[in-house]
Amino acid sequence: MRTLRESLKALATKNLSARELLDASLAAIDADLARGGATYTQIDRLAAREAADASDAFRARGYVPSALAGVPVSVKDLFDIKGQVTTAGSRILRDAAPAVRDAAAVARLREAGAVFVGRTNMSEFAFSGLGLNPHYGTPMNPAHAKRLAGGSSSGAAVSVALGHVVAALGTDTGGSVRIPAAFCALVGFKPTARRVPLEGTVPLSSSFDSVGPIARSVDCCVLMDGIVSGQALDTAPRPLAGLRLGVTSDYVADDLDDTVSTAFNRAIGMLQRAGATVERFAFPELHEVAGRYPLAGVTAAQAWAWHREHVARDADAYDPRVLKRLRVGEGRSAADYIDLLAARERFVRDSRSRLARFDAWLMPTVAVVPPAIVQVENDDEAFFTTNAKVLRNPSVVNFMDGCALTLPCHREGELPVGLSICGPALADASILSIGRSVEVLLRHSANGATA
């Protein structure tokens, strides 16, 4: 599948029409369905064809609203699309009324001329990092069919990896864009949360929910982010020579899978040889996150506030594993919640201070390679243990109110591994600029070339 820039060029030079791009997209989707794929909860072929034909007609008259005009994209089934039911990957909302308007991010994509091919499958209510879904099926990792694609934006990543779309719109509360991007060897960007409006999106945690893209390149993510945020950032590549990059052994480096550790350390070595300064630093505050956020945290309390009425009416319709995590929030007192918010405020301050001397903080996106489906599908203990480990690293960035970009850093023949380039709130432009240069370096090495 082409990148956004390549698709734009093909459309601009009339080598392809929007309808031809869509036909290729739908053919790839049909092939996935024939194999039993569970990438989507809904595919609206008629609306997609109407949008593609309209884009071609507008282009013929000289009207091209953006680089996304006429380009197929997918939308996570957490966003309202006018006239459609938003299920959030759950049976609970199947009979809800259709949305009367687009979610804010979807409306911006529509105004930009994007062609929506379907609503992508996900972990129920976005409350898992693994991507399992007992209601709509579990999207499989495209490169490794017996392994998980990651979650919660599982279908979003698969839709890009299989070439259905050039980019996908997802959400990230504790890694839900970056985990599936890393597991599917893609690029994923979690922006500073407040940059993209959340109106019309089913919430998980109002403190941490972020809207971000999954795509094949940093450039694709920049283009998507510029549209959904309404902000055109200056993301010109920054030279690697002279960059000051931080790496810590605290918490996020604990118990790494050997493949992850090897790929991460190899990437660090490449950056050093390219002229970047990599400094090892202590980050003891991360251990407070380990004690507070993943176990009970703000997310569970805020999720329970939204779900409690649904649980009271229809608890049996929930995935039992999601319900168990939701009920953690049921027992939180007001005092507990205030303490959690205060802990978060301290961590935001402390992390900003710790990272102030660096251009970016680097860590493995996920501590493990994509788990085998059979490992967690029918074993609750394995599910919760693996889910916690998968969420561990990326959730730190949400807790510190930061932004992060994940890039593939494995080599051909290795299981997928992601390298995260992280920064504090509103460092988005800098992180994307650095990401452009790191991406070139890593791609040079992907086939075993020496940097």
Sequence positions of predicted segments:
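Serine-dependent amide/ester hydrolase catalytic core
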Residues: 6-12, 57, 308-399, 450
